[in-house]
From Swiss-Prot:
One of its GO terms (cellular component) is cytoplasm. The gene is tig. Pfam families: Trigger_C, Trigger_N. Consists of 3 domains; the N-terminus binds the ribosome, the middle domain has PPIase activity, while the C-terminus has intrinsic chaperone activity on its own. It comes from the Bacteria. Its main location: cytoplasm. This is Trigger factor. It comes from Borrelia hermsii (strain HS1 / DAH). Its EC number is 5.2.1.8. NCBIfam families: tig (TIGR00115). One of its GO terms (molecular function) is peptidyl-prolyl cis-trans isomerase activity. It catalyses: [protein]-peptidylproline (omega=180) = [protein]-peptidylproline (omega=0).
């Protein structure tokens, strides 16, 4: 079908291709559509399928030619992309540059398409890249801290007949009052639940309600400093009416052998639980160390390269990041857009980081593509066995899932990516920094 294609790279990580289709194929596709029209058209005086082509062409020529061009472009692009050196991104639709395409049965059909592709660049030698990683040890106090967190997670929330204290879980109604002590209805909030002393409530009235009892009402006055955490309230005065509707407390379990058994039947003693916690913490340290090493290496390599990120790829990733931010912080995108920064302002905050992450992703993908490691059936079988063990499923069920969903190819790609990652981590040079605490290490980011 395609006689030839003239391909060239253009700025913006884009590809321009001039595709030429044989006139014989064009004529054949046109006749095919014409025949389809003939088999379906109802024209007075003719049986279906017996309408002369000349009559159909006289009445529907423009439609048939337009549909022929549409089919030619779709079919030829499908064929072109299968063998294209520069694969198109899935983020954007290829654009046909020709403003008006016409069919001339005496000439080959030609059109120009522009599409965004993965950027072209070469990976430099990464054997001498050095990565700085802080030292970390898991101490007994670290284990105790994690145990206390587990203790809090398993606390029961029960009614508290006493007054409000730091740590109380309260349900309140509150509203701003004007100078005449009338309620400003737009500020009214009902059944607001928070933990006293641990919340980030807008008005910051945690300390003002300490000592209050259930069903008690109180009017408080607040003067907010210039550096208050919510700029809308900075340098302002507010009068609030607060009603305590409910008070609860956490019934924290004792740290003993029974607590360990409640966490998991296989634990007989508290010491066994502590050993399990330490093992998990050491695993987290190992995973974090590997993640930091790979992230730092990819970042260092990408900074040395001039990688032109396709605009469609960048916009898609930026949109995902903003949506994730909105979801995590439970902020509706419309409200985000109506905020003082606006949606565009919020997006600007993430742009630099998104750009860096995309460059690192592209560098890693290029390393994977360049790697000659082949994934064998044995590698695939080992991974399926591991997944069956981890999920407590039968191996046959795991295999059936991947086969029915047509995911074995994707799984092979993931296995290769992990093998390449392991190879990189094995060879990277690590420079150890000063020791930091476990929790600080888990929250540590490269460049800190």
């Amino acid at each position: 079908m395609i006689l030839n294609d003239d391909v060239k790279l253009i700025p913006g990580s884009k590809v321009e291709a001039v595709i030429k289709i044989s006139k014989e194929f064009v004529k054949g596709k046109y006749n095919e559509i014409l025949q389809d029209y003939s088999s379906r058209l109802k024209i007075k005086g003719f049986r279906i399928g017996k309408v002369p082509f000349s009559i159909i062409e006289g009445k529907y020529s423009d439609n048939i030619r337009a549909l022929t061009i549409e089919k030619l472009i779709h079919k030829s692009l499908e064929e072109f992309f299968k063998s294209a050196t520069y694969k198109p991104l899935g983020y954007a639709v290829p654009k046909i540059l020709d403003e008006k395409l016409e069919i001339d049965f005496n000439k080959d059909f030609e059109f120009t398409v522009v599409y965004e592709a993965y950027p072209e660049f070469e990976i430099p030698d990464i054997s001498n890249v050095e990565v700085e990683i802080p030292e970390v040890t898991v101490s007994d106090s670290d284990v105790e801290d994690e145990l206390k967190l587990l203790q809090l997670e398993n606390a029961m929330v029960v009614d508290d007949s006493g007054d409000v204290k730091v740590g109380s879980i309260v349900r309140v109604d509150f509203v701003e009052l004007d100078d005449s002590l009338s309620e400003i209805l737009t500020t009214k909030r009902q059944d607001f639940v928070f933990t006293v002393g641990e919340s980030n409530n807008y008005y910051g009235f945690d300390n003002d309600i300490i000592g209050m009892k259930k069903d008690e009402e109180k009017i408080i006055e607040k003067n907010y400093s210039a550096d208050y955490k919510f700029s809308e309230l900075a340098n302002s005065f507010k009068r609030l009416k607060i009603i305590i509707k409910d008070i609860k407390k956490r019934d924290i379990p004792e740290l003993d052998d029974d607590f360990a058994k409640d966490i998991k039947d296989s634990f007989n003693t508290l010491e066994e639980l502590k050993a399990h916690i330490r093992e998990n913490m050491l695993r987290l340290v190992k995973e974090k160390r590997e993640s930091l090493k790979l992230s730092k290496l990819l970042s260092d390599v990408s900074e040395k390269l001039n990688i032109e990120i396709p605009s469609a790829m960048f916009e898609a990733e930026l949109k995902n990041v903003v949506n994730e931010f909105s979801t995590q912080n439970k902020i509706d995108l419309k409200k985000l857009n109506d905020s003082s920064m606006g949606l565009e302002g919020v997006s600007d905050v993430f742009k630099e980081n998104v750009l860096k992450k995309l460059k690192s992703k592209l560098v890693f993908q290029k390393i994977v593509d360049n790697d000659l490691t082949e994934i064998t059936d044995a590698d695939l079988e080992d991974e399926l066995v591991k997944q069956a063990e981890d999920t407590k499923m039968r191996l046959s069920e795991i295999k059936k899932f991947y086969q029915e969903k047509n995911l074995l190819g994707i799984l092979k790609d993931e296995i290769k990516r992990q093998k390449v990652k392991d190879k990189i981590l094995k060879n990277v040079k690590e420079i150890k920094l000063k020791e930091i605490a476990f929790r600080d290490f888990i929250n540590y980011k490269t460049g800190e």
